[in-house]
Curated annotation (Swiss-Prot):
May have a role in spermatogenesis. The keyword Nucleus applies. SMART domains: CXC (SM01114). This is Tesmin. One of its GO terms (biological process) is spermatogenesis. The modification Phosphoserine is found at residues 34, 67. Keywords: Cytoplasm, Developmental protein, Differentiation, Nucleus, Phosphoprotein, Spermatogenesis. Pfam families: TCR. Residues 263-372 form the CRC domain. It is found in: Cytoplasm; Nucleus. The gene is Tesmin.
Length: 475
């Protein structure tokens, strides 16, 4: 009797469940309730076959307030710093194409004479970039998009989804002028490959210029101004790369007329052996200029190389022409020249260039570079006095073609043999002439005239001796 009465009465739990899950309540709008298949036993708990506990998926989103319909504008206050997030898709849809063909300039692949197959796993680093012209930004991008795409630049090697999904994830609609590309850099740092993922799968080549320490000595490219690179557009990773050599004899496409890349390790040029004996900087005893060793980090190796060179030859860094004081023995070549046909009267003869005569240690043939040689006397004296346009057909003065006295240059002082002894003798003559005028009690003007006449006589005597030593006559 009591059990029947208690079973007919509704408890607080039943009233709460009817209030929440009733057909007239809004919370049950998105729930798919299924009726019970049969009467449950008294000892078993009733099971609610709804969207939370059932195996079937709900037909509509559970939280409509956080899932607006497509096309509806979402308030900025709701999203905050996340303007847009990519939709989650299964990895089965991301199917990369079977292969890409990459055209590489023949200058970038020395030794490659035909198509070669390079798998992606063979040390290739893929960097997603998008090349735009300088001064233009990414179309349709915003500061929030740029901040969202910034972390992508730190990825050096990653896996990409399909091109359609990557375009949606980038948040930047593609325009017809954009040229998204993937730059593949080998681990050795030797080449970079450029892949264009246009609609027609057209492949384009790209000129690359290595960066050296001294950019002024490197020939500049004839291409237009460099272009800026923006990271953001993700492209599918090809399974294999077919390296096809392309002869660089045609015009490059307008989309890739540039060679600017993101800042990274510079492409090092060919190594230069700077501690060898045939290095000009090392032979002259100076540090290398515009070389890879232009610093003090290799000082220990440089000191060892210098010591080894000096052990073999103590005079290795000494000049070929010895140094002497004024009035000492004449200079001579330490090894001697080895001229064959010039007669030692050309500038490439080291003895003639140093204005010294050949000695017994020279191995020259038909030498004319000696003291009493008339050709040497004429060549040593006349080039300092000749005008640059006297002989149009010859760049040097030949003794057979020379005729007449040389003309003095207008912008150059004449060479003279005036020494300190000549100056002292001239001053002594002038003082003697002044004392003589003072003893005779001449007027000041007459005394000045006598001193000037004595100076003219001394000067004419000096010039007479100078011309006589050169074989010239004064009319």
């Amino acid at each position: 009797m009591e059990d029947a009465l208690l079973g007919a009465m509704t408890g607080p739990e039943d009233e709460l469940g009817a209030e929440l899950f009733g057909s007239e309540r809004a919370f049950a709008d998105g729930l798919a309730l299924s009726p019970a298949g049969g009467a449950a036993d008294r000892d078993e708990l009733p099971v609610l076959a709804d969207a939370y506990l059932g195996a079937t998926e709900p037909g509509e989103p559970l939280l409509r307030a956080l899932s607006p319909p497509p096309g509806a504008e979402v308030p900025a206050a709701l999203l905050g710093d996340f303007p847009g997030l990519p939709e989650l898709r299964s990895s089965d849809d991301a199917a990369p194409p079977p292969a890409y063909s990459v055209h590489v300039l023949s200058s970038l692949l020395p030794g490659a004479r035909g198509p070669a197959l390079l798998p992606l796993s063979a040390g290739v680093r893929v960097i997603p970039v998008e090349i735009k012209e300088a001064g233009g930004g990414v179309p349709g991008s915003s500061p929030e998009d740029a901040a969202f795409q910034a972390p992508l630049a730190q990825e050096s090697c990653c896996k990409f989804s399909s091109s359609q999904e990557a375009e949606e994830a980038s948040g930047c609609p593609r325009k017809k002028d954009s040229s998204p590309m993937v730059i593949c850099q080998l681990k050795g740092g030797a080449q970079m490959l450029c892949i264009d993922n246009c609609g027609a799968r057209e492949l384009k080549a790209l000129h690359l210029l290595p960066q050296y320490d001294d950019q002024s000595s490197f020939p500049q490219s004839e291409l237009p101004k460099p272009m800026t690179t923006l990271v953001g557009r993700l492209l599918p990773v090809p399974a294999k790369l077919n390296l096809i050599t392309q002869v660089d004899n045609g015009a490059l496409p307008s989309a890739v007329n540039g060679a600017a890349f993101p800042s990274g390790p510079a492409l090092q040029g060919p190594p230069k052996i700077a501690l060898a004996g045939y290095c000009d900087c090392f032979s002259s005893g100076d540090f290398c200029n515009s070389c890879s060793c232009n610093n003090l980090r290799h000082e220990l190796e440089r000191f060892k190389a210098i010591k080894a060179c000096l052990d073999r030859n103590p005079e290795a860094f000494q000049p070929k022409m010895g140094k002497g004081r004024l009035g000492a023995a004449k200079l001579r070549h330490s090894k001697g020249c080895n001229c064959k046909r010039s007669g030692c009267l050309k500038n490439y003869c080291e003895c003639y260039e140093a204005k010294i005569t050949c000695s017994s240690i020279c191995k020259c043939i038909a030498c004319k570079n000696y003291e009493e040689s008339p050709e040497r006397k004429m060549l040593m004296s006349t080039p300092h006095y000749m005008e640059p346009g006297d002989f149009e057909s010859s760049h040097h003065l030949s003794p057979a073609k020379f005729s007449g006295p040389p003309r003095l240059r207008k912008n150059r002082q004449a060479f003279s043999c005036i020494s300190w002894e000549v100056v002292e003798a001239t001053c002594a003559c002038l003082l003697a002439q002044g004392e003589e005028a003072e003893q005779e009690r001449c007027s000041p003007s007459l005394a000045e005239q006598m001193v000037l006449e004595e100076f003219g006589r001394c000067l004419s005597q000096i010039l007479h001796i100078e011309f006589k030593s050169k074989g010239l006559k004064i009319e």
